[in-house]
Swiss-Prot record:
Residues 1-38 form the signal peptide. GO terms for cellular component: extracellular region. This is Cell surface antigen I/II. Residues 943-958 have a biased composition (Pro residues).
Length: 1562
């Protein structure tokens, strides 16, 4: 915190009201239609004023008025929010349809126009586009259908006409062809008859010759056949002999071949081994050969490279050698030529130098004559030039003056131009930024569209799949429903039989087992460590089972879970897993179970969320999540304070709840309320419809009853079960069910070998229904309370049914869907929903970027004046140029003989590498030849069979000719009938009706264009209402009027100029009477809307600009749009609140803005209104009230108004201790970024501070300190927006002079937030006047008021100075720690006897309640210090005694100091009373002592020296004990006038007195 002090003049005044606030008189502000802004609504006055305008409950110093009532127009408009009246008709172009109908009529088609089809009224342009697209598609389809029908009909007519013409032509051709065919037929019949007669004659002659030739051939052939048969018999005999001889020869040959094959097999095997060895040798050779060839190649390549390098170097060498030799020859030739030329040139130079010498002598004589004439001419020219220069300088001065003026004018114009350029650049930068934003919005719109399109395509694919699956799923569902219906009909017949639901129902909640569920917990109690739970199981009541590796939950003593180090920061799981794997539990025997543990008090809760559910369904639809809230019933009667909940990870296992502390309890109970909600796959709460929830294992013994109560839904009894319902509680209502035969129990709950039906209390027991029932539940949120209670708290005590013995206050219960009734059908199939085809997303309309503003025109700069022209100086005469004497030319040096280049060194050839040795080819083994094959024998050739003589062929029998058949005459022609004309078709068409109700949306924003609907903004904030209208649809009628009417809320100050500036395109009017603003679209705007009626058009919107001017106000607003006087709609209602409104539903932190001021003492005790001693420190505690601003959305300009805290303290009474000022936040953290300045008065403050205070209506009376946020934005973000109050502790010391005068002072503070001021309460304290008094008395009686001040005291008289201390009033602010009497008496005339006494002047009450009465002696609670040399005595109260006095008690004491008058004269005396470090002087007493010659005692010589003797006197050595005050002190004043010995040390005092007397005498 930075501290700064500023000093000024302030007129001092001390009175009963030393401080306060001078509040500016707050001008009345109209709540509607006012033409001034909030910054202008306060005035100040020079007179003190009080805080006004607390109508809102907020102590505002400016704009204090409460918000007025809403106008009738505003209320009516808001009550009708969202209502519409009329619509905008949309006409979809139907040109194509009309043309198709017209063409159809022209073509002769029967055209019928049907009634118009109403497509309804849509809300948005997008919906209109969709509908218009549907209509367009329908019109297109109608037109296409009509055109198709028309074209078909026209085609049919044309085809019919063509077909008629075709048939007629064809029939004519048929007729002509028939006549032609008949003539040809007749000619052909005549030809055929003649030809057939000639063929028959020729055939009959050939047949006679054939028969004679056939008889001769048959005879020859019979003789040839007989000869052949004879030859054949001889052939067959010879063939047999040859075949037998050949068979014998072949057998001998086959034997020889077999022997030869065997021998050759052996040879082949040997040859195979030879081949292998040869192959190995060959491979090795080829490897070496390859290596040789590679190395040979490398060597050859290297040698070739070396040779190539050598040849290249040789070529270069030869080239360079030729060049060097030529260069050297050229250089030598040039040198020799140069030598000859040099000799010739030097001879010429020698002759020329002789001529030069003569010319130089002639030039010198001529120059000296010209120089003399020049000097005379030069003097005349200089005189004329001096006159010209003076004239030029005068003109130059005038020129420079004008030039400066022109340059400044041009610079100013340039600066203005550059400022305009900068403004233009800034504006264009803003437009560029806006265009960038537009690009981003367009890109976002495109990305959003593409994302929606991708989703649509995915949804479409899913839809198509779902559409294919739907019939299958529907069939499965309907089959199951039919099966369930049949089962329920059967169960209805048996509902009164054991184990059946009395109200048969299907179980649509499948919720039996979830071993893999995930559990997460939250709690307002405490999480327990798993190690703490394990430790608790290992102790006391549960130890025995623990040692057997059994976790017996109902034996666990929960006091072992109540240590501070048992608490975990989050859920930890425990159970028979991990290092407890293999252990058993009483919950599920050897099956693994896990649970999280919490420790709760009555009324506390734990909320469990179960996920990863795999087996649970409702109506066939998967359950994804269950949320249970477990709350300890505050009415539970268990004796302890804590309940341990073991919440199982499997929600179907439920909860183990225990308040068992190791001892059974009588008349006890423990109940847990279970609130639960089930969620479907989409994360939505499931709305149960008669879902069955099992309540099972409800045991009843004669000392304990387990029950369910306070449940939603309806109880369903199971026939034969012991569980019923009574008085809203579900339990075994009529009998016990613990052991057979006891209290009417039918079976024993646990298994007994000798008892059939025992063990019903197991989930898999066939008669588990005996201890169970069901609850039929509906709705998304349900609850049931379960627990256990002593029987005597439910039914009267009874030896059988209810005995008063102790029980453990614990219970394990589970809520699941496992209904114990028999044959309950389950719903496993979800009723499939017909898939809905997704709608394709609408392609976005992209915003158009705004053009940049043109650059400003560069100014026309003034032309700078023409500088004066200097009169040219007369040319000085040309001074004759000294002659340039010719220099004799030196002779040319002899040419240098050239250095010839050395010839290059010839290159050296790199020697070739030696080629590698080529490997020797291997010597291969020779394979052995095979044995030659035996020679096959020569077999005898078989004899040649005889060849029969071929038969002579028989002659060919002549073929009887085929006579031509007489052709069939042509058929009579068949003529084609003409086709039937096509029937005339009928086409129908219809038009559509479509209307649009464009939607409107009202938005409320701050000056940073941030949405502030249903939020909080500071008073005086600029609030903008944006009146937005959706796109006007395509196909609309021309828009002739577009009017928006907005009845503004009360307390909202309308700014017409800003509104007009923010609403281009609209004419703005304002009705002050109704506080209503009306926007009418201009002609230009309407022209834009009507530019293309075939396309939708984006509307522009007006913006209402104004300020909110009330504390604790709610500003609600909507508007009405009217288009063409045919369509009207009321917008949504927006709402914004200002701070200072308690019970604000939109802003729960909102409350009154009330800075507070409290005065405390050093111990932190509030001392408002108490008496405060001078010199004490006031610890003023100022609260900067910021919590109501939490979640504020004020704009940056409002925030920049700053945050201030003003402390108007009374500088007349208090001294500021700015070095001790401390600022902390509500969390105790030190606040940084706040500076504090101190000003002696308002006039001493800078103008900035004066303006802030003036606008806030605050005028401090005098000095004040002001705290301000250095960086308003950081302060706002850190403390204001987060709603964190600040505490300022500002210590101030009560000035000492206040104790001299007394009086009251008051103190007030103010906070200024966003320019709005609020006053704190006023603190008033009173400073008592401390007025010590001094008397001179002759007695020690406090009741003796005889004062001899101003009188005569005889010499050697013993008397008393009575020192009456100042009174400390009752109810003072801080403890007394110092109350002293200091008396500087005149030791020349008075001698202190060493005796004093102290008495109470008022009743004194101590902190322990004891009282010392007025008049009681207090000497024992004091000490005295005496300096006899200086004549000073100090009597001090012990600090412990003073601090034991109650601050509610008054305090005053008086001291009596005994003196003896030892000198003659007049003596004056004053004493000082010190109270808590502040000294107060008493009145001065004066006494006179005359000479007394009869007095035998020599008076002390005033001039004699005195020895300084300091006495520290402590009348009592014991510390003050308030409790013994009544026992040791009298309750009344002391009336004895004699001085009593002071606590046994009078001898010591006397000794000091004697020493003092002795010193005087010495």
């Amino acid at each position: 915190m930075k501290v700064k002090k500023t000093y000024g003049f302030r007129k001092s005044k001390i009175s009963k009201t030393l401080c306060g606030a001078v509040l500016g008189t707050v001008a009345a502000v109209s709540v509607a239609g006012q033409k001034v802004f909030a910054d202008e609504t306060t005035t100040t006055s020079d007179v003190d004023t009080k805080v006004v305008g607390t109508q809102t409950g907020n102590p505002a110093t400016n704009l204090p008025e409460a918000q007025g009532s809403a106008s009738k127009e505003a209320e009516q408009s808001q009550n009708q929010a969202g209502e519409t009246n009329g619509s905008i008709p949309v006409e979809v172009p139907k040109t194509d349809l009309d043309q198709a109908a017209k063409d159809a009529k022209s073509a002769g088609v029967n055209v019928v126009q049907d009634a118009d089809v109403n497509k309804g009224t849509v809300k948005t342009a997008e919906e209109a586009v969709q509908k218009e697209t549907e209509i367009k598609e329908d019109y297109t389809k109608q037109a296409e259908d009509i055109k198709k029908t028309t074209d078909q009909y026209k085609s049919d007519v044309a085809a019919h006409e063509a077909e008629v013409a075709k048939i007629k032509a064809k029939n004519q051709a048929t007729k002509e062809q028939y006549e032609k065919d008949m003539a040809a037929h007749k000619a052909e019949v005549e030809r055929i008859n003649a030809a057939n007669a000639a063929s028959k004659t020729a055939y009959e002659a050939k047949l006679a010759q054939y028969q004679a030739d056939l008889a001769a051939v048959q005879k020859t052939n019979a003789a040839n056949q007989a000869a052949y048969q004879k030859a054949l018999a001889a052939y067959q005999a010879e063939l047999k002999r040859v075949q037998e001889a050949n068979a014998a020869a072949k057998a001998a040959y086959d034997t020889a071949v077999a022997a030869n094959n065997a021998k050759n097999t052996e040879i082949a095997a040997a040859n195979e081994e030879i081949r292998k060895r040869n192959a190995t040798a060959k491979a090795e050779y080829e490897t070496k050969l390859a290596q040789y060839q590679a190395e040979l190649k490398r060597v050859q390549e290297a040698n070739a490279a070396n040779e190539a390098d050598y040849q290249a170097k040789l070529t270069a060498y030869q080239t360079e050698l030729a060049r060097v030799q030529k260069a050297n020859a050229d250089a030598k030739a040039a040198y020799e030529a140069a030598v000859a030329a040099n000799n010739a040139k030097n001879a010429a130079l020698t002759a020329e130098n002789t001529a030069i010498k003569q010319r130089n002598e002639n030039a010198k004589a001529t120059y000296e004559a010209a120089l003399k004439q020049y000097e005379a001419d030069l003097a005349a020219v200089k005189k004329a030039n001096a006159a010209n220069e003076a004239d030029y300088q005068a003109k130059l001065t005038a020129y420079q003056t004008e030039l400066a003026r022109v340059q400044k004018a041009n610079a100013d114009a340039k600066a203005a131009y550059e400022a305009a350029v900068a403004a233009n650049n800034a504006a264009n930068a803003a437009l560029t930024a806006e265009n960038t934003a537009i690009k981003k919005r367009n890109a976002d719109a495109k990305a959003d569209y593409e994302a929606k399109l991708a989703k649509y395509q995915a949804d479409l694919a899913k839809y198509q799949k779902d559409l294919a699956d739907y019939p299958v799923k529907l069939k499965a569902y309907e089959d199951e429903q039919a099966s369930i219906k049949a089962a329920l009909a059967e169960l209805e017949k048996h509902k009164n039989e054991d184990g059946n639901l009395t109200e048969p129902s299907a179980q649509n909640l499948v919720y039996d087992l979830e071993p893999n569920a995930n559990l997460s917990l939250t709690t307002d109690g405490k999480f327990l460590k798993a190690s703490a739970v394990d430790d608790a199981f290992s102790k006391s009541t549960s130890k025995a089972k623990y040692d057997q590796k059994i976790l017996q939950l109902d034996d666990l003593d929960i006091t072992n879970l109540e240590q501070s180090n048992d608490v975990a920061s989050s859920m930890e799981l425990y159970g028979n897993f991990g290092d407890k794997a293999g252990w058993s539990t009483t919950v599920s025997n050897n099956s693994q179970v896990k649970w999280g543990s919490v420790l709760l008090e009555r009324g506390q809760s734990a909320t469990a969320t179960y996920t990863n559910l795999q087996n649970s369904y409702y109506n066939g639809k998967k359950i994804s999540k269950i949320v249970y809230k477990y709350t300890v019933d505050p009415k539970s009667k268990f004796q302890g304070q804590k309940v341990w909940l073991g919440i199982f990870t499997d929600p179907t296992l439920g909860v183990f709840a225990s308040a068992y502390t190791g001892q059974v309890e009588k008349n006890t109970s423990i109940f847990i309320k279970n609130e639960f909600t089930f969620y479907d796959e989409d994360g939505k709460p499931i709305n149960f419809d008669n879902a069955l929830l099992s309540v099972a294992s409800l045991n009843r013994e004669n000392n304990s009853i387990e029950m369910a109560k306070d449940y939603t839904g309806k109880f369903v009894k199971i026939s034969g079960s012991s569980i019923g319902e009574k008085n809203g509680m579900i339990y075994a209502t009529d009998t016990l069910n613990f052991r057979q035969g006891q209290g009417g129990a039918r079976w024993t709950m646990y298994t007994r070998a000798s008892e059939p039906g025992s063990g019903w209390d197991s989930s898999d027991a066939p008669n588990s229904w005996y201890g169970a029932g069901a609850i039929r539940m509906s709705g998304p949120n349900n609850s049931v309370t379960l627990g256990a209670i002593s029987s005597t708290l439910v039914v009267p005590a009874d030896p059988t049914m209810a005995i008063e013995t102790g029980k453990k206050p614990n219970i394990w219960y589970s809520l699941n869907g496992k209904i114990r009734a028999v044959n309950v059908p389950k719903v496993t199939k979800e009723k499939p929903t017909p898939p809905v085809k997704p709608t394709a997303p609408t392609k976005p309309t992209y915003e158009t970027e705004k053009p940049l503003k043109p650059a400003p025109v560069a100014p026309n700069y003034e032309k700078e004046p023409t500088p004066p022209t200097r009169t040219p100086d007369q040319a000085e005469p040309n001074k004759p140029t000294p002659p340039t004497y010719e220099t004799e030319k030196p002779l040319e040096p002899a040419p240098v003989e050239p250095s010839y280049e050395a010839e290059p060194t010839p290159p050296t050839r790199t020697p070739d590498q030696a080629e590698p040795n080529k490997p020797t080819p291997p010597t291969y083994e020779t394979e052995k030849p095979l044995e030659p094959a035996p020679v096959e024998p020569s077999y005898e050739a078989e004899p040649t069979p005889p060849t029969p003589t071929p038969d002579q062929p028989e002659p060919n029998k002549p073929v009887e000719p085929t006579y031509e058949v007489i052709p069939t005459p042509p058929t009579d022609p068949v003529y084609q009938d003409l086709p039937t004309p096509p029937s005339v078709p009928t086409v129908h068409f219809h038009y559509f009706k479509l209307a649009v109700q464009p939607q409107v949306n009202k938005e409320i924003r701050n000056n940073n264009d941030i949405n502030i609907d249903r939020t909080l903004v500071a008073k005086q904030s600029v609030v903008k209402f944006q009146l937005k209208t959706a796109d006007l649809p395509a196909g609309r009628d021309e828009t002739t009027s577009f009017v928006l009417v907005d009845p503004l809320p009360s307390g909202y100050q309308f700014n017409p100029e800003a509104t007009k500036a923010a609403s281009p395109g609209f004419d703005v009017t304002y009705d002050n009477a109704t506080n209503t603003v009306t926007f009418k679209a201009t002609a230009a705007t309407l022209a834009t809307f009507n530019a293309d009626l075939t396309k939708s058009v984006a509307t522009i919107y007006p913006t209402v600009v104004g300020q909110v001017l009330n504390d604790g106000a709610t500003y609600k607003n909507n508007f009405t749009l009217t288009v063409n006087d045919a369509y009207g709609i009321k917008s949504n209602v927006v709402r914004v609140t200002t701070p200072g409104k308690p019970n604000d539903p939109d802003n729960p932190n909102n409350n009154y803005i009330k800075p507070t001021k409290v005065n405390k003492n050093e111990n932190g005790v509030v001392i408002d209104g108490k008496t405060v001693l001078a010199g004490s420190t006031n610890y003023y505690e100022l609260t900067w009230d910021l919590d109501q601003y939490k979640n504020d959305r004020s704009s940056a300009d409002t925030i920049q108004k700053g945050f201030y805290y003003v402390d108007d303290y009374p500088e007349e009474a208090l001294e500021l201790r700015q070095d001790l000022v401390k600022i902390t936040d509500a969390n105790g953290n030190e606040v940084t970024g706040v500076s504090v300045d101190n000003y002696t008065n308002l006039e001493a403050a800078p103008q900035e501070i004066r303006d802030v205070l003036s606008k806030a209506g605050i005028r401090p009376k005098g000095a004040f300190q002001i705290f301000r946020a250095d960086n308003p934005r950081e302060f706002y973000d850190t403390y204001v927006k987060t709603g964190i109050d600040l505490k300022i502790v500002s210590p101030m010391v009560v000035k000492k002079q206040m104790g001299q005068t007394g009086g009251s002072y008051e103190n007030q503070a103010y906070q200024i937030d966003f320019g709005n001021g609020y006053a704190s309460n006023i603190i008033i304290n009173n400073v008592p006047k401390i007025n010590p008094k001094k008397d001179v008395t002759l007695t020690l009686d406090p009741a003796d008021t005889n004062n001899v001040d101003g009188q005569t005291i005889p010499l050697n008289t013993v008397f008393n100075y009575r020192l009456i201390g100042g009174i400390i009033p009752a109810d003072h602010s801080e403890e007394l720690f110092e109350y002293n009497f200091y008396d500087d008496y005149d030791q020349t005339g008075d001698h202190y006897t060493g005796q004093y006494k102290v008495f109470a002047k008022v009743d004194i009450t101590f902190k322990d309640g004891s009282i010392i009465k007025s008049g009681a002696e207090l000497t024992q609670y004091t000490t005295a210090e005496v300096d006899t040399a200086k004549g000073a005595i100090t009597i001090k109260f012990k600090e412990a005694f003073l601090r034991s006095v109650s601050i509610d008690s008054a305090f005053q004491a008086e001291s009596y100091i005994q003196m003896k008058r030892i000198a003659v004269g007049t003596f004056e005396n004053t004493y000082i009373n010190t109270v808590n470090g502040v000294t107060y002087s008493s009145n001065t007493v004066k006494t006179t002592t005359p000479e007394d010659p009869t007095d035998p005692t020599d008076p002390q010589d005033p001039s004699s020296p005195r020895t300084s003797t300091v006495i520290n006197y402590k009348p009592q050595s014991t510390a003050y004990q308030p409790s013994s005050v009544q026992e040791t002190l009298p309750n009344t004043g002391v009336t004895n006038n004699a001085y009593m010995p002071l606590l046994g040390i009078i001898g010591l005092v006397t000794s000091f007195s004697l020493l003092g007397l002795k010193a005087k005498k010495d």
